[in-house]
Structure formats: structure tokens, C-alpha cells
Swiss-Prot record:
UniProt subcellular location: Cytoplasm
Natural source organism: Arthrospira platensis (Spirulina platensis)
Organism ancestry: Bacteria, Bacillati, Cyanobacteriota, Cyanophyceae, Oscillatoriophycideae
Keywords: ATP-binding, Cytoplasm, DNA damage, DNA recombination, DNA repair, DNA-binding, Nucleotide-binding, SOS response
Protein name in the entry: Protein RecA
NCBIfam families cross-referenced by the UniProt entry: tigrfam_recA
Segments for region (Disordered): 344-365
A GO BP entry: DNA repair
PANTHER family hit by this protein: MITOCHONDRIAL DNA REPAIR PROTEIN RECA HOMOLOG-RELATED, RECA
Amino acid sequence: MASKTENSEKQKALNSVLNQIEKSFGKGSIVRLGDSARMKVETISSGALTLDLALGGGLPRGRVIEIYGPESSGKTTLALHAIAEIQKTGGIAAFVDAEHALDPTYAAALGVDIENLLVSQPDTGEMALEIVDQLVRSVAVDIVVVDSVAALVPRAEIEGDMGDSHMGLQARLMSQALRKITGNIGKSGCTVIFLNQLRQKIGIVYGNPETTTGGNALKFYASVRLDIRRTQTLKKGSDEYGIRAKVKVAKNKVAPPFRIAEFDIIFGQGISTIGCLIDLAEETGVIKRKGAWYSYNNENIGQGRDRTITYMQENPAFTEEIDKRVRAALAGGAVVSATSVVKLDDNPDTDDHDVEDIDENTDEE
């Protein structure tokens, strides 16, 4: 066991080297973790209460996040909701539209302040990632969304001919860029969300043939990776009005991973926040369901899920009360199912809310 004299000498030596490091590299270059504000990771709401629960509070600030999935599964919708949540708190958001496909009307419908949203449509992948780096280093931007990694085309590929081979060029670009900007992201507290597409590996007989574009660097640098899939098509009669999305937290460095959340995405409106609230209210026992009827404090509020959603939309004070009770129940340790939600096809009121299953094996690029 070390004596008090030895401990005192060690402490002096430690203080000396810490002072030397701070003189060489600046104040804050090395800190005790217990004294650091980084111990508590701040979060941003994803716009879906079920997903916030699966993430352990929401999307982490000052981290790299990857959202990937098949086409039309809700990747851009989820990113736009995160932007809207940041803007509600007075934050500044930027959208790097490498796909040149951003719809301002849809973004506004989701609650995005398009008048103050910074948008860039870069010509090359190098230009896009340099813009991201400069926005992050400015410490003035709270969230940057890159849509998408697959559309970050290296300059050499654009300047070359159509049939030229550029093996691994995009992967090297992403690896170099992430090495450069990850440290700045942590210091600035800016959240950077990369949207990514899926591709199929050739010749894979066993295991999952799906992979994401841009190489492996993003998988390592990302603190959170979200796999989003379209599981059902929502219908009223023969009219399709939305989809059911399932998100698996494939990686999470700030909370337990592999949790699953489901929510509705309504065409032209985005994530159904009230739908998420009803699902969790039923799971926590705040709202009861008997057959097709939903009730609160032994009073029926709606027959079928859709009518209950309509009732809550028309009564914001009631919705706020339910929201407070659900959050209090969750904070008190209420247990919910693995998916955090009720399966829509378990709803006996099938005339009110029809669904059509989606075969995920058909979702290919």
C-alpha cells in the first residue's frame, strides 16, 4: 500500500504534467471526467416518443448519427423532424442536400422553419463534406443533416467518363472526412446526421446480404446507427394514407442498443406524434382498451385507434394531460414491450384502420 508521501509525490507529478499539457495544447485539452460537463450527454427529440424511449432519451448532441434503410422508409422524414425539434428550441439547422431532392413544402408541413433552414446542394462529395466541416467548426450550428452518403460523389468520378472504375474512392473520401470532422463535432456540440442507402452484396448465400454505402468508416465513427424499415402500408378502404415504420437501434454508445420502436408516418404530415402517445399510453396503463374502445378514467374517448387520434387532435388540453401522465409513468420505471408499441394488426376495429404488410425482402436498391 502506497504511503501518504508517495501519494503526495504522485499528485505533484500529475499536476505538473497536466499544467504542461495545458500550456502546450490549451486549457481543456485534458480534464478529469468527473469534472467534465461531457459526463451528461444532452439529447434532441426525434419527433417520435417511442423512438426517444428506445434511444434512452433522444438523439445525442455532439455526436455522429447514421440513419439507413430502404427507399421510402422514412429516413428523410425522421431527419426533418429532428431539425424541427432543434428549431423549436431556437437552434440553427443546416441541410446538405446531396441528392438534390429536398421538398420545402413537405419540410414545412413537418414543422421545419424553412425560412431559417440553411440548405446546400453541393456539386461534389468533397464540397459537401468541407461545408459540413466548416459549419461544425463555426460552433453556431446545432444540427447538420447530410442526405445522403450514397450521393456524395467524389470529384474524380464526376470529372471522369461514365464507364471509368473508381474502386473504393467514396470509402476513402468518407474515412478522411470523418477523421477530420469527428473531433470538431465533439467540441462544438453539433449533431451531424448522415442518411444512407442500402446495397446488396453479390454472392452472399448465408447471412445478411445488405450493406450501406461509403465503406466502414461511418459505422465506426457513428455513436448511434438507426435501421429504419417500412413494415406496413396504412389504408382507409382502398386509399393509402401512410406507412408503419420500425426502427432498430443497431448501435448506441450512449444507451443500451438493439431496442426497437415503431410509429406511423402519415403522408404529407410526417410522424404521428399522437399515435406514438396512444401506443405508450396503452402500454403504461394510462389509457385502457377494451375491444375497439379506448377509455380514460373509465370514460370512452374513441372507438378504434383512428377515432381516438382524431379526438386527441381536437382536444389539445386532454392530449397534454395524457402526455404528462405517460412521461411520469415512464420516468417512474413503467415497463413497456420490446417494441414500445401495440401492433396495429391486433386492433379489432379493422374497418376503421386497415394495414397491408410489406415484405422486407422486396426492398432493394
